[in-house]
Structure formats: structure tokens, C-alpha cells
Amino acid sequence: MTNIRKSHPLAKIINHSFIDLPAPSNISAWWNFGSLLGVCLALQIITGLFLAMHYTADTTTAFSSVTHICRDVNYGWLIRYAHANGASMFFIFLYFHIGRGIYYGSYTFMETWNIGVILLFAVMATAFMGYVLPWGQMSFWGATVITNLLSAIPYIGTSLVEWIWGGFSVDKATLTRFFAFHFILPFIITAMVAIHLLFLHETGSNNPSGLTSDSDKIPFHPYYTIKDILGLLFMLLALMMLILFSPDLLGDPDNYTPANPLNTPPHIKPEWYFLFAYAILRSIPNKLGGVLALVFSILILMLFPSLHMSKQRSMSFRPLSQCLLWILVANLIILTWIGGQPVEYPFISIGQMASISYFCIILILMPATSLMENKMLKW
């Protein structure tokens, strides 16, 4: 008799995806982030569902309803902070996951990579709309500033912004629709994750050497299930320490002031995970130019397969490319720092230099270095 795991139509899908899946024998802890992102997504959907049971998407009561969740709902404070800090963990893992993909050349799986970039855009949109929901000062002004960027689009810009707002300013209609979109998007993301995995399982996982591993595969379970559970324990430890010891560490104090359209906060800034893109946006004095730079700073990820000039897939044996990648990481940290600073000297010029460096490293220096490494190896 055949094992039900291998014969039942539903169990068969799970078996081929998580149990009998052939996996390379040498994948490192950098391959843990995919499963951790899956756990984060599940955590966000579950905590978000419980928050939605008590939240009201109305300008007069939204702020009070969040306060009510934290004060009066059983473990409401825990659910709220798990959701807010869970989003931060989500982005930390996303950036690690993308960084690993760049380092080890995983972007050569074109379909998987491009769906991943679309997923990144969807997660960023979801996080932005979620930040608006508590209806604090930074929620309101963040929504106003970021949606206003669309007015830079020639001819249709102003009409488009008013259409998104549902009026002539960010108001009740905007909050209601943002809540609706914030609720539905994670389910769309879940469906896209399934497609992401579908394409990944067509090719199989990459590995640190960048070489094909068909001759040396091991079953996913128990080897990588145990490894993923260990990663999960570390994640939960970090997340619980963040929630229980300093839940507001990554938030903005201005968001504890109810939204007031008549009073602008001294410095409008998004959550920490958008600061690098915000710095790139602000570094260009022209509005349309800034918006294009902002979009292209993420969209540039889709160019990685075309910009790959090396004869080797992974950076494991390419020290010059490795140095350049770590310079890019340092550059992104500088951009994140600049995004949180006021628009004044010397931050403006530092931001402009870091923005130029960002695009130069990816578009010029990395391909040039790859070609140079090929020459050094006489390929």
C-alpha cells in the first residue's frame, strides 16, 4: 500500500514541496530566510486579523480604537506590538533574503527573482498603508506626503492623487480604502508566494558554490525542517525581546499624537525600512526626478540578471565583487541614516553622494568588476 503522503492529491503537493523535496546538501543559514519570511507572513495575517476585529477605520475613532486595543482588549498590547514589530522583522528578513540572492547569484532564476521583486513592491505597499491606519500625526502626514508624490506624473497626476484620496485631502475615504487594501493585500501576497515557490521548485534551490547540485541532493525533511525550526527559534527570541522590552524602539513618538491636519510635524519620515528609498527620493531637487529615482531604486533589482557579466554565478570565489557588495550594504546603511535626518547641510550632500554611489555601484562598478575578474582568470 502506498503511503497516503505520496498518494493523496493534497498531501502529494505538500510532500513534494516540504518533505521529499530534493535540496542541495550544502546550503547555509542564508537559505533560512525564505521560511522565516513565510512564518512572518503567517504571523502578520493572524495578528492583523485579531486587530481588525477591534479596529475602526474612521477618522474620529481610529486612534481611540488602537488605544482601546492596547488598554482594554485581552493581550491587545501584545497583538498590536507583535504586528508592528513583526513588520520590522519581515523587512529585515526581506533585505537579508535579497542580499543573499545577489551574493550567490540566485537572480539567474529569472521568473523566481522577478516575482520576488513584485512581492517586495506588494509588501512595501501593504506596510505603507498599515502605517496610516493608527491615524497618528506621522500616519496622516506620511500618507499626505507619499500619495502627493503621484502628482508629479505629468497631465494626470493631480486627478490621480484626488482619486486615490477620495476627496481633496487625506480624510475618512482615504483611511477606509487604505484599511480595505491593507486587509486584502496579504492574501494576494500569499498567492504570489505560492507562485514564487512554484517557479523555485521548477529549477531547485541555488547553493553557496553557485554550481549545479543535481549530483548531490538530500531530502528537505528532516535536514532542512530542523534547520528552519532552529532559525525560527532565534527569530521568535529576537521578536519577543523587541516586543516585551522595547516595543516602540523602531516607531516614531509623533504617532502617539492624534492626526491633526492643521499642525505639521517638524520632520516627516516613514518607518525605518523605507528610509533608504526616502533618502534617494529627497536627494533629487526635482519632484518627478525624485519619484522616478525612488521607483527605480527598487526596480533596479530586476536588472540584476542582465547586469551579470561574470562567468561564475556566485560571489563565493570573487573577492573584488564581494568587497563591492559590502560597500553597497554600507552605502544603504548610510542612506537609511540620512533618510531619518532633517533636510539641511551636510545631510543633503551626503544623501546625494550616497544616492549616486548606489546607482553607480549596481549599474557600472559591479558589471565592470565582474568583467575584470573574468580577465584575471583568463576566461
From Swiss-Prot:
Q: Where does heme b b566 bind?
A: H97, H196
Write down what this protein is called.
Cytochrome b
Q: Which gene encodes it?
A: MT-CYB
What membrane topology does this protein have? Multi-pass membrane protein
Name the positions where a ubiquinone binds.
H201
Write down the SUPFAM superfamilies for this protein, in alphabetical order. a domain/subunit of cytochrome bc1 complex (Ubiquinol-cytochrome c reductase), Transmembrane di-heme cytochromes
> GO molecular function of the protein, one example?
ubiquinol-cytochrome-c reductase activity
Q: Which residues bind heme b b562?
A: H83, H182
Q: How is the cofactor bound?
A: Binds 2 heme b groups non-covalently.
Alphabetic keyword roster: Electron transport, Heme, Iron, Membrane, Metal-binding, Mitochondrion, Mitochondrion inner membrane, Respiratory chain, Transmembrane, Transmembrane helix, Transport, Ubiquinone
Q: Where are the transmembrane segments?
A: 33-53, 77-98, 113-133, 178-198, 226-246, 288-308, 320-340, 347-367
What assembly does the database describe for this protein?
A: The cytochrome bc1 complex contains 11 subunits: 3 respiratory subunits (MT-CYB, CYC1 and UQCRFS1), 2 core proteins (UQCRC1 and UQCRC2) and 6 low-molecular weight proteins (UQCRH/QCR6, UQCRB/QCR7, UQCRQ/QCR8, UQCR10/QCR9, UQCR11/QCR10 and a cleavage product of UQCRFS1). This cytochrome bc1 complex then forms a dimer.
